[in-house]
UniProtKB/Swiss-Prot annotation:
Active site: 209, 238, 255 (proton donor)
Compartments where located: Cytoplasm
Catalytic activity: 4-phospho-D-erythronate + NAD(+) = (R)-3-hydroxy-2-oxo-4-phosphooxybutanoate + NADH + H(+)
SUBUNIT field: Homodimer.
Pathway: Cofactor biosynthesis; pyridoxine 5'-phosphate biosynthesis; pyridoxine 5'-phosphate from D-erythrose 4-phosphate: step 2/5
UniProt source species: Blochmanniella floridana
UniProt similarity note: Belongs to the D-isomer specific 2-hydroxyacid dehydrogenase family. PdxB subfamily.
Lineage: superkingdom: Bacteria
Enzyme category, top tier: oxidoreductase
Residues noted as binding substrate in the record, renumbered to the chain: 45, 66, 259
Protein name: Erythronate-4-phosphate dehydrogenase
Length: 372
């Protein structure tokens, strides 16, 4: 079987190479003439899959190592009997830890405590729900907006309308797919009206899709002097992004929130598992063989938000990724290369923390660290 994969996806040869002919290439360069004799295509969100790409191909199976599938024409695949699998939830831990890392970084810089803030979470799927759980473990007040989930889960008291959530939140974080149609389209859902309604000195975080926020409206309101702290991991028109907007944001990164080592392994392992099921191939790979067993140990004598911030930075300092984007954005393929050659970043569970206190250990465990 012939397999073509994005060269930035790890472990493709290790997982698929023993019984197949595997090739890798730049995901943006994948074209129709490369797919004529290919059976399996493994991609990221930068590859647009539609009739123009597949019309003359022999593709039977497509795996995308992403939660969202807005880059794939699902109707075309269904009509042509092409199996498509994605990895919803595989990057949830990584994105949530990125969001928390940015919040703790801002808290240290601006001298505030998260427990004194209200966090509004827009989109309560795999990522939004996990963020809700993590913040709750620290006693942080949260409000939720998800018109689809709230219809099914009426027990939570945190559900709010979008207008109320925006007006009552000190921190607004977005975890929605990019949609253009339906009852609640998310394209440009954060526009001038929403930005005007944000309280002064609030924090806006987007790790979903760039076009969920109208970047022109955001730049205009920042230029007018409104005080909003902005965290952007995703941008309209990636890999091109607004350099003026980058100059205003507090943290700007190259769409790497979901790029922890563990999340990337989870994603490609799920694609491999689905591939094995679909083609009835024996699954030969386990987690340990992919190098996920390494762990570090640290003991702490007390637990507060300052200690938690130090623990987070032992694993991941988000400001380094901000500096990397600012230093490389003007270079040839700078944005793409930051993603393609992203550093070896672990999740918090790779740090074993012992606070010598069962209650504190329970908090640390619920927040994502390994504990005794």
């Amino acid at each position: 079987m012939r397999i073509l994969a994005d060269q930035a996806i790890p472990y493709v040869y290790k997982l698929f190479g023993s019984d197949n002919y595997v090739q890798v290439c730049d995901g943006r360069s994948i074209s129709a003439n490369m797919l004529k004799d290919v059976d399996v295509l493994i991609i990221r969100s930068i590859t647009k899959v539609n009739h123009m790409l597949l019309y003359d191909s022999s593709i039977k199976f497509i795996g995308t190592v992403t939660s969202g599938v807005d880059h794939i024409d699902q109707n075309y695949l269904k009509n042509n009997n092409i199996r498509c699998v994605s990895t919803p939830g595989s990057n949830a831990v990584s994105v949530v830890e990125y969001v928390c890392a940015t919040l703790f970084w801002l808290a240290q810089r601006d001298c505030f405590f998260l427990r004194d803030k209200t966090v509004g979470i827009i989109g309560v799927g795999n990522i939004g729900n996990l963020l809700y759980q993590r913040l709750n473990s620290l006693g942080v007040h949260t409000l939720l907006y998800d018109p689809y989930k709230s219809k099914c889960d009426t027990d939570r008291m945190s559900w709010k309308s979008l207008d109320i959530l925006v007006s009552k939140s000190d921190i607004l974080t977005l975890h929605v797919p990019l949609t253009y149609t339906g009852a609640y389209p998310t394209w440009h859902m954060i526009n001038k009206d929403i930005l005007d309604a944000l309280p002064s000195n609030s924090i806006l975080i987007n790790t979903s899709r760039g076009a969920v926020v109208n970047n022109d409206d955001l730049l205009a309101i920042l230029r007018c002097g409104k005080k909003i702290n902005v965290i952007l991991d995703v941008w309209e028109s990636e890999p091109k992004l607004s350099l003026p907007l980058l100059s205003y944001v507090d943290i700007g990164t190259a769409h790497i929130a979901g790029y922890s080592f563990e999340s990337r392994i989870r994603s490609i392992k799920k694609i491999y598992d689905d591939y094995c099921d679909y083609f009835n191939v024996k699954n030969k790979v386990n987690w340990i063989s992919l190098g996920l067993s390494d762990i570090r140990y640290i003991a702490v004598s007390r637990l507060d938000e300052c200690i938690i911030n130090r623990l987070i930075q032992l694993v991941y300092n988000v400001y380094y990724d901000h500096i990397a984007l600012k230093n490389n954005v003007l270079r040839l393929r700078g944005f793409d290369k930051l993603r393609e050659y992203y550093c070896f970043r672990r999740e918090w569970s790779s740090l074993l923390v012992d606070s010598k206190n069962g209650y504190n250990n329970d908090i640390l465990f619920k927040f994502g660290f390994s504990t005794l």
